[in-house]
């Protein structure tokens, strides 16, 4: 490759490396595959990504991704507004919904605390969570973070945040494997963890 083509190829590899669990070798293989065999699909991927960047935003209530002001769950008036489940990422909402074990509402942190990567309290949208709690009918908050070092650190910060607020606070039971991310937990185990959630504090300030 000449220098310009090499720069373009290396830029593509660099862009692919931002994806989760994609290292330099995987990114290089993906780049070769897209350019050599899947050019039409690559163009469709670029178009889909550009469309998503233009149209997808954060739900005004729960902070997940949606198109428009509210996501489908927040707009559903049949949901139980008394229970708010706090999760790490939108994938956790999808997994919990698939397990059919929570008919309340959600708040998506869009991050978790990871001191090794310099991700502190600012990574978990506490300001937006505080806004979500204003003027609502919420009675119980369910902390649904993973049982990893990052998830436990996030759960601790959340429990401290809720300590002096008038809500019953609970956390998923440890039926979820230690070190397990909710995204990869089967529906039965996840449902059991929700139903057997552990009380952190009773309602009342």
From Swiss-Prot:
UniProt cross-references to PROSITE patterns, sorted A to Z: RECR, TOPRIM
SUPFAM superfamilies assigned: Recombination protein RecR
InterPro entries registered for this protein in UniProt: DNA_Rcmb_RecR, Rcmb_RecR, Rcmb_RecR_Znf, TOPRIM_dom, TOPRIM_RecR
Residue ranges covered by zinc fingers (C4-type): 59-74
GO biological process, one term: DNA repair
GO molecular function: DNA binding; zinc ion binding
Record-annotated Toprim domain positions: 82-177
Gene3D superfamilies: 3.40.1360.10, RecR Domain 1
Origin superkingdom: Bacteria
Keywords: DNA damage, DNA recombination, DNA repair, Metal-binding, Zinc, Zinc-finger
Role according to the record: May play a role in DNA repair. It seems to be involved in an RecBC-independent recombinational process of DNA repair. It may act with RecF and RecO.
Name the UniProt record assigns to this protein: Recombination protein RecR
Organism: Neisseria gonorrhoeae (strain ATCC 700825 / FA 1090)
């Amino acid at each position: 490759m000449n220098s310009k083509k090499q720069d373009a190829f290396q830029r593509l590899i660099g862009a692919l490396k931002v994806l989760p669990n994609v290292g330099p070798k995987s990114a290089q293989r993906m780049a070769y595959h897209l350019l050599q065999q899947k050019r039409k699909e690559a163009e469709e991927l670029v178009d889909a990504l550009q469309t998503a960047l233009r149209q997808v935003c954060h739900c005004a209530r729960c902070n997940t991704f949606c198109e428009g002001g509210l996501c489908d769950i927040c707009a559903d008036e049949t949901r139980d507004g008394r229970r708010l489940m706090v999760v790490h990422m939108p994938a956790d909402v999808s997994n919990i919904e698939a397990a059919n074990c929570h008919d309340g509402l959600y708040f998506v942190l869009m991050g978790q605390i990871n001191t090794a990567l310099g991700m502190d309290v600012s990574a978990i949208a506490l300001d937006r969570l505080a806004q979500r709690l204003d003027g609502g009918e919420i009675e119980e908050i369910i902390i649904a973070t993973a049982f990893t070092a990052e998830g436990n650190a996030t759960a601790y910060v959340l429990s401290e945040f809720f300590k002096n607020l008038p809500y019953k606070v609970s956390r998923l039971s440890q039926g979820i494997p230690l070190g397990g991310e909710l995204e990869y937990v089967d529906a039965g185990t996840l449902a059991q963890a929700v139903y057997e959630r552990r009380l952190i504090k009773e309602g009342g300030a």
